[in-house]
């Protein structure tokens, strides 16, 4: 989990840092768990841009990840820790006792040769997956389901973890990485530990080309666009934006404007919003 710096023999190397990938044990993924991944370039099924600044980048295959962890009671041995170009976390190839191979999100401390389990009888050990009702209060967890059996949706990014704070009847109370406190049904599963690659947030990309390799395109300021492209556009030279406050490209207030729906179905599950004291 170390970070490598470079001698500034070129301008782009002066700030650039990279992960050492010392936890990675192989560069050859399991072929049976790969599927082709077509480039979307931020377009939807109609060909319209729904996510700006996306396109290009290196070719990649999608790794099929087991987010459900429903193979209960069968031990699985960790065969390798691998890099996944589709996410910030590392992944672990596990081989079950019956011969089946699956990828899981690798937590911090998981090594080749370790044995992981899932189910109500699994030990409270890094990498094991259990329902929240079987996990002790205070445990650090990741890969959390929002609906039982749907698969993990929360706490999957590199270095992230949630904490099980309490249990009340049919619900568990979790503190998420954002600081949000919310209810989750106790039948939902979670994995023990913190997600791997904890130094990902201090990596400095360092140069534009590296960002392009990751599939990101340049971001252009609205004030240098035409008025039909952005509310800040138009005018002669370096003109003011012409509005009392900054706006998004779609005319909504920018910088701190709340975009969450007032009557979202999950409002009743949130005890404390992120950022609140």
Curated annotation (Swiss-Prot):
GO terms for cellular component: large ribosomal subunit. It holds the Pfam family Ribosomal_L2_C. Residues 218-277 are annotated as: Disordered. GO terms for molecular function: rRNA binding; structural constituent of ribosome; transferase activity. Keywords: Ribonucleoprotein, Ribosomal protein, RNA-binding, rRNA-binding. GO terms for biological process: cytoplasmic translation. Belongs to the universal ribosomal protein uL2 family. One of the primary rRNA binding proteins. Required for association of the 30S and 50S subunits to form the 70S ribosome, for tRNA binding and peptide bond formation. It has been suggested to have peptidyltransferase activity; this is somewhat controversial. Makes several contacts with the 16S rRNA in the 70S ribosome. Part of the 50S ribosomal subunit. Forms a bridge to the 30S subunit in the 70S ribosome. This is Large ribosomal subunit protein uL2. It comes from Clostridium novyi (strain NT). The gene is rplB.
């Amino acid at each position: 989990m170390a970070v490598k710096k470079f001698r500034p023999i070129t301008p782009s190397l002066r700030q650039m840092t990279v992960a050492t990938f010392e936890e990675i044990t192989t560069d050859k993924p399991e072929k049976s768990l790969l599927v082709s991944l077509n480039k979307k370039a931020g377009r939807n099924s109609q060909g319209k841009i729904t996510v700006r600044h996306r396109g290009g980048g290196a070719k990649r295959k999608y790794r099929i990840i087991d987010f459900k962890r429903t193979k209960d009671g069968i031990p699985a041995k960790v065969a390798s820790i691998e890099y996944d170009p589709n996410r910030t976390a590392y992944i672990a190839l596990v081989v079950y006792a019956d011969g089946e191979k699956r990828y899981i999100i690798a937590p911090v401390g998981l090594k080749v040769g370790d044995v992981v389990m899932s189910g109500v009888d699994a030990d409270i050990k890094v990498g094991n997956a259990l329902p929240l009702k079987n996990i002790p209060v205070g445990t650090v967890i990741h890969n959390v389901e929002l609906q039982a059996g749907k698969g993990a949706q929360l706490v999957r990014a590199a270095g992230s973890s949630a904490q099980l704070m309490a249990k009340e009847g049919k619900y568990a109370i979790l503190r998420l990485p954002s600081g949000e406190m919310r209810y989750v049904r106790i039948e939902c599963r979670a994995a023990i530990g913190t997600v791997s690659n904890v130094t990902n947030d201090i990596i400095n990309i360092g140069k534009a080309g590296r960002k392009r390799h990751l599939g990101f395109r340049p971001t252009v300021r609205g004030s240098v666009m035409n008025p039909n492209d952005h509310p800040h556009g138009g005018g002669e030279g370096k003109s003011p934006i012409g509005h009392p406050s900054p706006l998004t490209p779609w005319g909504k207030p920018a910088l701190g404007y709340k975009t969450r729906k007032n009557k979202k179905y999950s409002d009743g599950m949130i005890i404390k919003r992120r950022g609140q004291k």
